[in-house]
Amino acid sequence: YGGRVSSVLDIYQKEGNSNEFHANGGIGIVSSRLLVEGPLKKEKGSFLLGGRASYAHLFLPLFDVDNIAYFYDLNTILSYNLNQNNNIYLSVYFGRDVFSLNDSFENTYGNTVLNFRWNHLFSDKLFSNLSLIYSDYYYGLNLDFVGFDWNSGIRNFNLKYDFKHYLTNKIKLQYGLNSIYHKFNPGEIEPSTSTSGINPQKLIDKYALENALYFDVEHQLTDNLTASYGLRYSNFLRLGQDELNVYENDQAVIFNDELQIYEKAEPIGTEEFDRSDVIKSFNNLEPRLALAYQLNNKSSLKASYNRMTQYLHLLSNTSSPTPLDVWTPSGTYAKPQILDQYAVGYFRNFSNNMYSLEFETFYKTVQNRIDYIDGADLIANDAIEQVILNGRARAYGLELLLRKNEGQFTGWLAYTLSKSEQQTEGRSGNEAGINNGDWYNTPFDKTHDISFTGSYELNKKWSFNANFLFQTGQPVTYPNGQYEFNGIRIPSYTNRNEFRLPTYHRLDISANYTPKPNKTKGFRAVSSTHLRAHETNN
């Protein structure tokens, strides 16, 4: 994997049943789901169609609740066996999440994904997957209180060709290539009413091409020691069809010595690029190494190092009164983020694998972490470079995971103790930097994160589930006053992310009942109760 400096979620889609038709679903208080599957041609092809939707927003007005939140998604996959060595797959996903607050604004976001994959078996030791992927991420805000709608997004056209090669029973190779064409919509504004004083505005689309070659080796060195090592080469081209501002000394942000704050620089000109022009290019090597040593048949140790590069930046100004996400490519002013991560872990199982315990500690650093000047405005800003600076970040902590894998009661308990900080120092001795150049909490810092999931099977008809989540509140920055300069009122802030939102914890329980477990396959009635939510810090 590559292209991201945070976690990657690896999802495998379930294939439909190619022999017989099945349907199952669940009806809940706040949401329901349905999944149907069956053969397209017996033992040759299959289909799977699944959908989910929530409907709590239909009942909230009955309780005088103005806030609305709901989601819906649809997932389908078609598979067909051409012959003994070739299989093809077509999958489609569409999903939306909607949240509105007191009729003031509505936030809608979601993804559309189309994926065609060809699986080819060269021999019993070599096979490949060729994938063509289209994705469309949408993010929109309806701001009725100011009279306009705003949306942004990113479309990706992705080609992947991956190989798995079993050289021997001790050496397995994975190698391949990846090429992604990105089209960014930085923002578009439309008046939401006929009486709105807002003029329509569409920012210029941005384009980029991201390429990668990689190989990875899984090597069993001894009976107890296994090594995974590899190298990924990545290349990123920021493409043209754009008009870029030119600044004195290439600085789009300047430091005001008198006020001790960062401000937007005035452009001294513009430079135009054609669609075929390369505005900026980047190249990076990303090595990775992981070692696993089995102490005995119950326990093992592991250690790893990896470097990753992320060329896309998610701009999200958490100090803004409205939520906002804008994707932007690396370029002259937004440098690629480069991650170096180290981890050491220990694993042990107990009572013939009935219980297992995992422990891991980690430390990672990120170069070129995006930071924002005070008062940064991301909505319809065609000069984003005027409100961002390149800094750095670090995160460290430990994770514990305890599982119970067998018996009437199964589940897991996870705990993470961590620290996530960032720093943006001054570019010269005359600049104070963001937050006086000191380390401060990132918006994602959560000192404590506890989650519990448990399932108890009373009998074949009845089962009970519980989910508990506890998280330290998100860091926030509050203004502590204002001052006037040349007739302009300027807010004064405390140190960045010095305060926190209330601690968040919730408990959800559900009872599942299957009326005729041996006759009615897949039918399940579900009731769920939400017991706890936010709690104010003392």
Q: What is each stretch, according to the model?
A:
Residues 362-365, 384-480:
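Gram-negative outer-membrane beta-barrel transporters
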Residues 202, 210, 329-335, 341, ...:
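Outer membrane beta-barrel strand-and-loop segments of large Gram-negative receptors
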Residues 138, 183-195, 237, 244-271, ...:
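Surface-exposed extracellular loop regions of Gram-negative outer-membrane beta-barrel proteins
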Residues 28-55, 64-98, 106-129, 161, ...:
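Transmembrane beta-barrel wall of Gram-negative outer-membrane proteins
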Residues 529-536:
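Conserved small/polar residues in nucleotide/adenosyl-binding loops
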Residues 1-20, 34, 38:
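N-terminal periplasmic accessory domains that precede
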Residues 44-47, 85-88, 124-128, 170-173, ...:
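Repeated loop/turn-to-beta-strand initiation elements of outer-membrane beta-barrel proteins
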